[in-house]
Amino acid sequence: MNNKSIMTDFYELTMAQTYFDSGKKDEEVYFDIFFRNNPFNGGYTLSGGLEEIINYVKNFKYGEEEINYLRSLKIFNEKFLNYLSNLEFKGDIYAVPEGTVVFPNEPVITVKADAVTAQLLETALLACFNHGSLVTTAAKSRKHSCNGVRCP
């Protein structure tokens, strides 16, 4: 499976089916992405991962292979699986610009989408932001510690 849309916590899928089954799939929801601690016990974080998030969302879909895998688990009903096979992101994402200094517990990305899509995006977007910000912050820290001299 090369499709990254399946990159989610299992409970996100079961929650999405719950929204679907309860008739709440089309409700517009918002969720914020934030982080709890600065990397390396530092005083700040630089936002990162936005390009990866944009690419992930642009390519967000469940293909035949992913649907067949989910079907094999015998947990998800056929109506929900059919819905997933046609799902596309039709929402909005608001984010602080790449490289912005950000601090713990403040929203850095806001997602507006239908309840099912928002639920399914959460894990991957958190992973992309956290990894991207870790790398961006580490690079800035390394550059700063070298004080203009080429570091080994």
Where are each of the predicted segments found?
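Ordered alpha/beta subdomains of enzyme catalytic regions
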Residues: 1-152
